[in-house]
Amino acid sequence: MSRSSDLFHKAQTIIPGGVNSPVRAFKGVGGEPVFFKSGKGAYLTDVDDKQYIDYVGSWGPLILGHCHPKVIEAVDNVLHSGMSFGAPTELEIQLAEKIASLMPSIEKIRMVNSGTEATMTAIRLARGFTNKNKFIKFNGCYHGHSDSLLVKAGSGLLTLGIPSTPGIPKSITEHTLTADFNNLEQVAQLFEKYPNDIATVILEPVPGNMGFILPKIEFLKGLRELCDQYNALLIFDEVMTGFRVGLHGAQGLFGIKPDITTLGKIIGGGMPVGALGGKREIMSFLAPEGPVYQAGTLSGNPLAMAAGLATLKEIEKINFFEDLSNTTNKLTEALADAAENANIPFFAASLGGMFGFCFTDKNSVENYFDVASSDEVLFKKFFHAMLAQGVYFAPSMYEAGFVSSMHGDLEIQKTYDAAELVLNQLSA
């Protein structure tokens, strides 16, 4: 028995399910999770000293790879001055200014501790600002685990095979309206039905928690127009896409300005963090400036601020995203070539340093149902066989993958060689 297996069995006696976030338990692929002890660059090493090419990247934050020297140096400098003060620091201002200079829609920003806190606060703020209660989310889009947003959510809920979760009264979710991603007509119908009651529309502009889905530009433009028409706010949940698909986020790539943007992951450089930002008049509704309350003991933690600032300074460098996009494209092309050589139906797509794939004969994947109809059994076999070859993909077909600036031609070639071997075996 491996040390990973020993640790998982031990963890199950003291931690629910043996993990502190459900997707880590490998429920989506079967088997037992791998326990890791270190990471460097594009690689992870498990507790049994096996090395893997890492395409999870801590679920997105590690765009510079593991233990980037600039991030380590920044955190180390702050660490010896104090890990937390529960009071304002200059680093908070510096990171806020950096984010606002890069994100087109952000004029003011509030730091929080997680993506869940960011989206939860964004919904509360939108309701407070508009004095309306209902909001629209999209089937399969995941916005953290706050009560009102765990309705037809993606990510871990899809991995576990449940549409929502017990413990949330209907009275909390009665104001949550849902539509299919990329379906503007459904959204228009909801606005027509509740013309004076919808406070906001929230979405991942590029969903990464129901597989990897690229939006139709007409869909995003239509949402902006509908929100303007009905005096509702548009929230882009860019916790995953922010500084991942491009230097100015998905909003910069598609030229759509939301009213509120939520961020996380990369802006903490691997440390726990979240944020929400937007128009000055909206953000000024947050306490202590306005009446909408939000607070957090560790919000603006100096270690997270330092790591995030160091990360953003690196990704600002010339050609960073051009190089990252090229590497990610090479990866998806390599996987597609390996599948084609094995005569296995396969679809892959990418944007910036974010990608996804599934085993399907569809030429495009536009929503949750397209991903759900793909071959999950084959995905599970592929995942475990690639893991055995030292390639670590997300342990769920509903999760996007991530490439870092430390991935290069060597890692892509190794991944291709492994995929060709595995897919030929699976097609035999």
From Swiss-Prot:
Q: Write down the required cofactor(s).
A: pyridoxal 5'-phosphate
Which reaction(s) are listed as its catalytic activity? (S)-4-amino-5-oxopentanoate = 5-aminolevulinate
Does the entry feature the keyword Ligase, yes or no?
no
Modified sites of kind N6-(pyridoxal phosphate)lysine: 265
> EC number(s) for this protein?
5.4.3.8
Please name the pathway: Porphyrin-containing compound metabolism; protoporphyrin-IX biosynthesis; 5-aminolevulinate from L-glutamyl-tRNA(Glu): step 2/2
Identify the enzyme class: isomerase
The record's annotation in SUPFAM superfamilies points to: PLP-dependent transferases
Q: Which residues form a coiled coil?
A: none
Q: How does it assemble?
A: Homodimer.
Q: What is this protein called?
A: Glutamate-1-semialdehyde 2,1-aminomutase
- What gene is this protein translated from? hemL
